[in-house]
Amino acid sequence: MPRVKGGTVTRKRRKKMIKLAKGYYGSKHTLFKVANQQVMKSLLYAFRDRRQKKRDFRKLWITRINAAARMNGLSYSRLMHGLKLAGIEVNRKMLADLAVHDEKAFAELATVAKNNLK
């Protein structure tokens, strides 16, 4: 039986990895072995950070809401509890957007929350 070296398959596989490593610094975009390791690590980072991004944005929204709530004499937790008691269902993303772009509307929501806490 003749020996099969698989040259075209190997070349195609390596070329694909080098293509994925385009834009990487130094030997990471030219040498297959290093590029392969970096691409694998990059894919892991991408997978992990797609989930991390959701947590990061939630943290950011909560920080913004808390800052705006404290400007209106409430803490974040009391604001959220007051809104829940008032039956106002506004998600954190929208509340943070209001806190940044429409301070009057946020102040009205804070007033409603304050009144429902008593």
From Swiss-Prot:
One of its GO terms (biological process) is translation. One of its GO terms (molecular function) is structural constituent of ribosome. The keyword RNA-binding applies. PROSITE patterns: RIBOSOMAL_L20. Gene3D superfamilies: 6.10.160.10, Ribosomal protein L20. It comes from the Bacteria. Pfam families: Ribosomal_L20. Disulfide bonds: none annotated. The keyword Hydrolase does not apply. SUPFAM superfamilies: Ribosomal protein L20. GO terms for cellular component: ribonucleoprotein complex; ribosome. Keywords: Ribonucleoprotein, Ribosomal protein, RNA-binding, rRNA-binding. HAMAP family: Ribosomal_bL20. Belongs to the bacterial ribosomal protein bL20 family. Binds directly to 23S ribosomal RNA and is necessary for the in vitro assembly process of the 50S ribosomal subunit. It is not involved in the protein synthesizing functions of that subunit. This is Large ribosomal subunit protein bL20. It comes from Bacillus cytotoxicus (strain DSM 22905 / CIP 110041 / 391-98 / NVH 391-98).
